[in-house]
C-alpha cells in the first residue's frame, strides 16, 4: 500500500502525518508533540496501552524515514486515540473534544462532514 504524507496543524502543533494501510501513523517523537507532553510520559502510556487494550503487532510498524539508517517505530490511529484518552494536557483535552465530536456525529447522523473541504 502506498505511503502518503499529510500535514496536521492546529493552533499549537504542526505534524507531518504518515497515511498507510487506511490509517494514520505517528512516531513516538510525534505523539508527544501532538499532546504537548514529555516523551517519557507518552512512552509509559504506550506501554500501558499495549499491556491493557491493544495488540502491539498489529498497531506498531517499523518504517524507514528520510536521512536515517535506523527503522523507526510508528504507531497507528488506535494507539494515538488510546494515548489521547489517557494523557493530561491542554492538547489532550482538545484532542478528546475533537474525537468525542466525531464519534457523536457518527452516532447521531451516521456520518461526519469535513467542513474544511466544503
List each language-model region with its residue ranges:
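Positively charged, aromatic-accented nucleic-acid-binding surfaces
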Residues: 1-25, 34, 39, 64-118
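Short Lys/Arg-enriched helix C-cap and helix-to-coil transition segments
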Residues: 53-68
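Helix-turn-helix DNA-binding elements, focusing on the entry/boundary residues of the two helices
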Residues: 28
Amino acid at each position: 500500500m502506498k505511503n502518503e504524507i499529510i500535514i496536521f496543524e492546529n493552533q499549537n502543533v504542526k505534524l507531518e502525518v504518515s497515511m498507510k494501510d487506511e490509517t494514520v501513523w505517528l512516531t513516538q517523537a510525534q505523539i508527544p508533540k501532538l499532546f504537548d507532553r514529555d516523551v517519557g510520559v507518552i512512552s509509559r502510556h504506550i506501554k500501558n496501552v499495549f499491556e491493557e487494550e491493544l495488540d502491539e503487532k498489529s498497531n506498531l510498524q517499523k518504517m524507514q524515514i528520510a536521512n536515517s539508517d535506523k527503522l523507526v517505530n510508528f504507531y497507528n490511529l488506535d494507539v494515538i486515540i488510546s494515548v489521547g484518552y489517557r494523557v493530561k494536557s491542554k492538547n489532550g483535552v482538545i484532542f478528546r473534544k475533537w474525537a468525542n465530536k466525531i464519534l457523536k456525529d457518527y452516532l447521531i447522523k451516521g456520518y461526519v462532514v469535513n467542513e474544511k473541504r466544503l
